[in-house]
Curated annotation (Swiss-Prot):
Protein name: Venom protein 302
Pfam families reported in the protein's UniProt record: IGFBP
PANTHER family assigned: CYSTEINE-RICH MOTOR NEURON 1 PROTEIN-LIKE (PTHR14186:SF20), INSULIN-LIKE GROWTH FACTOR BINDING PROTEIN-RELATED (PTHR14186)
Species assigned in the record: Lychas mucronatus
This protein's UniProt keywords: Disulfide bond, Secreted, Signal
Gene3D superfamilies: 4.10.40.20
Subcellular compartments: Secreted
InterPro entries to which the protein is assigned, alphabetical: Growth_fac_rcpt_cys_sf, IGFBP-like, IGFBP_rP_mac25
Length: 93
């Protein structure tokens, strides 16, 4: 019984790190269209929905790029360059 519980916990933790829209078309179809994006749009963390791209000075990056992506012509400059998953700030290339 304990082995089954552990197995289910492992499966659930793997599932929680995945993007559900990869296999669920209705989630992709339910994406909201972003409005008033100053720098255009980019895809969200899962690559499913369009979101507003970050502009110069905004926070970006983080684990799996959870903080968002910078607009074209900007780069996410990490505050802590030693930490791969650290957040950054969008700056001109």
């Amino acid at each position: 019984m304990l082995k089954l519980v552990i197995l289910l916990c492992v499966i659930e933790s793997i599932y929680s790190l995945s993007c559900p829209c990869q296999w669920n078309k209705s989630l992709r179809d339910s994406c909201r269209i972003p409005e008033n994006c100053l720098a255009g749009t980019t895809k969200d963390v899962c690559g499913c929905c369009d979101v507003c791209a970050k502009i110069e000075g905004e926070s970006c990056g983080g684990p799996w790029n959870i903080g968002g992506s910078c607009a074209v012509g900007l780069t996410c400059v990490k505050v802590d360059k030693r930490n791969f998953h650290s957040k950054g700030v969008c700056k001109l290339n």
